[in-house]
């Protein structure tokens, strides 16, 4: 009886060690993507050769990790491109971005960035027939019910309630450009869109100052 128990114990240990050994050789979805991207690094770097096909394949590979993941690739600067790993503004996909970024390969021609970064506001944003330039949008902070969030009013020149949806999309894109994907999703709460004819317009600030003013308030939130 004692020998039987001892044999069962040995078998269990062997199985446990065997499963552990197998797990060492089984790659995660993130590791598989990194391996694939390293193998195809030059092809992706020169994506202009066949942009649609290469970008489609990139998206397919990312979706194997998480269906909400997406990417951005910058123009060449000093022999390098930026590769942005994005959750497309979906908070639930943030951990997937963090995990993939933690396994980023070291490639001389690439700089990997997690989440869409802040960018200087220089260009107008157009959706359908509505175009808003930086001078046509201003902001004002408001208190949010969630104390860990910052509420904001965006004043868009030309805004009407009938076209609220389009101007809301434009306003969100400006926020994303100004503050970056991470800060918008983590710290921006209520977003209200209004026109230049709103009674509080005179209290508004030019959109170019949004990052600086936001960071002043954010410091107090994350303490």
Language-model-detected regions and their locations in the chain:
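Long, contiguous binding/interaction regions
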Residues: 24-81, 87-223
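Classical Sec-dependent N-terminal signal peptides that target proteins to the secretory pathway
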Residues: 8-24
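N-terminal secretory signal peptides that target proteins for export/translocation
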Residues: 1-7
